[in-house]
Amino acid sequence: MAHVPDCDPEEDHEKLETDKYAFYVNFVRDQGDALEIAEKYREEKGIQSIILCPGFTNEEVGELSETLDDVSVNVARGDGPSGRIAQEAMQKAGWFE
């Protein structure tokens, strides 16, 4: 799941799968969208884990973890330089406007 300010969570999603694994990707605008989509995926698709983009704050990760108590909640974070590079790229793209 990734924060994308100009997305439509109901439209901006995809599923990749093999015979043994299903991987769902969903863009969300904010924490409200994230909670709604995550609960929907747990109930309708039976997800067992979720991977969040680095844009989720520790507080948001905690809230998702509390809400999805039976789902593993993980965050894809890089090292210090990677975070800075990603932040600069997002700023150039107008992410924070």
Residue ranges and their predicted role:
Residues V61-D79:
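Alpha-helix-loop-beta-strand connector modules within alpha/beta enzyme cores
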Residues A86, A93-E97:
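C-terminal binding/interaction regions
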Residues Q48-L52:
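Short catalytic-loop micro-motif centered on adjacent basic/acidic residues
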Residues M1-D8:
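N-terminal basic/disordered segments at the start of proteins
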Residues E36-E44:
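Short, well-structured alpha-helical segments in soluble
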Residues P81-E88:
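Short, charged, surface-exposed secondary-structure boundary motifs
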Residues G55-F56, R77-P81:
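Short, ordered loop/turn segments at secondary-structure junctions
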Residues L16-D33:
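Glycine-rich phosphate-binding "P-loop"
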